Amino acid sequence: MINAPRVCVQIQSFYVESQSEPDEERFVFAYTVTVRNLGRHEVQLLGRYWLITNGNGRQTEVQGEGVVGEQPIIEPGGEFQYTSGAVMETPLGTMEGHYHMVDHQSKAFQVPIPVFRLAIPSLIH
């Protein structure tokens, strides 16, 4: 799409050891997402789609309105940051997906969320 709004997504994930129970195959991860509007007009995040893949290859799809209960409007040069989480039965997995957004003229567009890893620190070299 030519003239598509310029939106950048950055993600940092981390293992939440205090809420995890490895002996019961429960691994809790959190991730902080920063959505930046690099364009000249405001954009609004309306919904999300996630594809979560655990270490055994089992996939779970999650979709819904907004993020953390919000549908933020992001001004030009602005950003929106939030933290959320995922629970898996393996110590390693990935997440990826896209955001459903609209531009200042209410035209819908998608912003891809690049694949990122969820892993306990001892598995990362």
Swiss-Prot record:
One example of a Gene Ontology biological process annotation: error-free translesion synthesis
Domain called ApaG: residue spans: 1-125
The species this protein was found in: Pectobacterium atrosepticum (strain SCRI 1043 / ATCC BAA-672) (Erwinia carotovora subsp. atroseptica)
Lineage: Bacteria, Pseudomonadati, Pseudomonadota, Gammaproteobacteria, Enterobacterales
InterPro entries: ApaG_domain, ApaG_sf, Uncharacterised_ApaG
Alphabetical list of NCBIfam families matching this protein: PRK05461.1 (NF003967)
Protein name (Swiss-Prot/TrEMBL): Protein ApaG
Pfam families: DUF525 (PF04379)
